[in-house]
Amino acid sequence: MPQERLGALRRLLREKPYIRVMEAHNGLTARIVETVSAESEGQTRSFDAMWVSSLCDSTAKGKPDIELVDFSSRVETIQQIMEVSTKPIILDGDTGGLVEHLVFHVRTLERLGVSAIIIEDKVGLKKNSLFGTD
């Protein structure tokens, strides 16, 4: 299953002019993204993939979004999401952390079946751009 999920995002991007992605930060929100659909003009539309946001993951854990939630905790969140969903996952990787750790993190995410990781092009302490603190 991880290998199927890993390539699913790439297939979607080849096959569709755009894809619908919704944030999920735990099993419940993943289940909602997995099952929700809407009918419009005779077509049923649903989400194609999930965005696992560091902001939402941190907030759900009662922590600030400053990379305080460690990688092991992020992996646990991803595993909870994967238990209830088959959709591709795009992970918010923040600044990527230490370069020495990034290779390990990417390999772990590949083994899990995460389709993409987004790394911010910033240096220094993580600051959430949604709060106007860049």
Give the location of each predicted region.
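Hydrophobic faces of well-ordered beta-strands that scaffold small-molecule active sites
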Residues: R20-N26, M50-V52, I89-G93, I117-I119
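Short coil/turn connectors at secondary-structure junctions
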Residues: E15-Y18, T44-D48, S85-K87, L112-S115
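N-terminal amphipathic alpha-helix/helix-capping segment at the start of soluble metabolic enzymes
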Residues: M1-E23, G27-S40
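Glycine-rich anion/phosphate-binding loops
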Residues: M22-L28, V69-E76, G93-L112
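Glycine-rich, proline-tolerant flexible connector loops at the mouths of alpha/beta enzymes
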Residues: S37-S73, G96-V99, I118-D134
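Alpha-helix-loop-beta-strand connector modules within alpha/beta enzyme cores
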Residues: E4-G7, P64-L91, L112, G132-D134
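Glycine/charged-rich beta-loop-alpha catalytic/anionic-binding loops adjacent to active sites
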Residues: L13-R14, T59-P64, K87
